Structures are given as structure tokens and as C-alpha cells.
């Protein structure tokens, strides 16, 4: 078993949406509760910055060196690190007050994929039970949002194979990682199938390495697993 070492003790309540920026060699993520805070750390000089956000933000995606896309409970937003300006790009489910956003990521063409779910937090940040699969999987492209999947519990894991032929996704409430065929040019999914099951915890967020192995965090399992897609 591999050894895990603490990199930075930032004392997040619920860290989500970690994203790597190759532009400036930095890691970005959000602590989503009780009030969302954006973190950015440069791995060259280990400078850590924090930014208070006016919205309940759960996922991040790089736009440019100075801008980042942020998925929030009722839309997608843009944040500028220099001006500190936070602005709405597009509304999503702003008429469904009982839902919130969850995980998300961008594909190789820059489309932003993200999921929504029933809000499982009270206003003070305390947890409340889920009792509905009211979430959906969305794709934002050319300032238009398309619904890809519905009736989701907790959408997690947004990763693509190195050759962009596969998309891996999970509904944590279902317990399985899913694999889709992915058409990069069209931004479309097909041939959904169960890909991976594990008896320790449930699938949460994931990333993929250069060899195509998927690293999946296990909610309730206190572990990370590395999965060979073959």
C-alpha cells in the first residue's frame, strides 16, 4: 500500500473541485462550506492564496492564467484573480431552489461538464439527508447548457481517458464507476456501462494519470484506489 503524506494543512471543512493549472503550475480548489472559499497554491514557491466567494461553489475549471470558471448552486461563474471580479456566465437550475451543484471538469475541447444534486446542507453548513434523485449531468459549450443525464443522486468523477475516447463518471448513491464512449468532436456520450465496483466506500471524485489509470477517492472508505481501465 502506498504512503500518503500531508502536503498542506489547510483545515478544509469540505474540500472539492481540485484542478491543476499547467499555465502557472498551481493547484486550485474550493472549501464549499459553510461559506465557499477558493484556494490557490503555486507549487514552485508554495505560495498559498485564499479568496472568499459570494456563492456556494463546488467545482473549478481553468479559463486562463488570470481567470477560472466556478460552478455554483444555480449557475456557472467566472472569477478574475487580478480584479477579484466574480460574474455570472449562465444560469442553471435557478428555478430549482432545493438543488445545488457538485463535481465538474472540462474536456479537451474546453466544454465544461458538471452535475447537480439535491442540496444536502442547511444554511449553517450542517448536513441533512437526501431523499430525492433530483440531480442532472450538464455540458456547457458555446454559452449553451445541455442536459446529458437526469435522475442523479450525487454526481461525481469527471475524467477522460488520455486518448479522449472514454468518459468516466459516477453517481455516488449507486456505488459504481461508469464508463461511456466519448466523441470529442461532438461532445457526446454513448454506450454507458458499469466499469468498476469496490466494497470499500462509494465513488467520490477522481483523476486520471498519463498511463490511463484512474485514481478514485472512496467516500466512507478512507482510501484512494488506482484502477487499471483494462
Regions found by a protein language model. Give the residues of each.
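A short beta-strand motif characteristic of beta-propeller blades
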Residues: 3-9, 46-52, 87-94, 144-150, ...
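Beta-rich, blade/repeat-based domains predominating
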Residues: 10-24, 54-69, 95-111, 118, ...
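Conserved beta-strand positions in repeat-built beta-propeller and related beta-rich domains
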Residues: 21-22, 27-33, 69-74, 114-121, ...
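Beta-propeller domains
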Residues: 27-51, 73-76
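A short loop-to-beta-strand structural motif that recurs across blades of beta-propeller domains
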Residues: 37-39, 75-77, 135-138, 176-178, ...
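Beta-propeller blade signature
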Residues: 130-142
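Loop/turn-rich, solvent-exposed surfaces of beta-rich toroidal or solenoidal domains
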Residues: 175-176, 196-230
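Short loop/turn segments immediately following beta-strands, especially the blade-tip
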Residues: 180-187
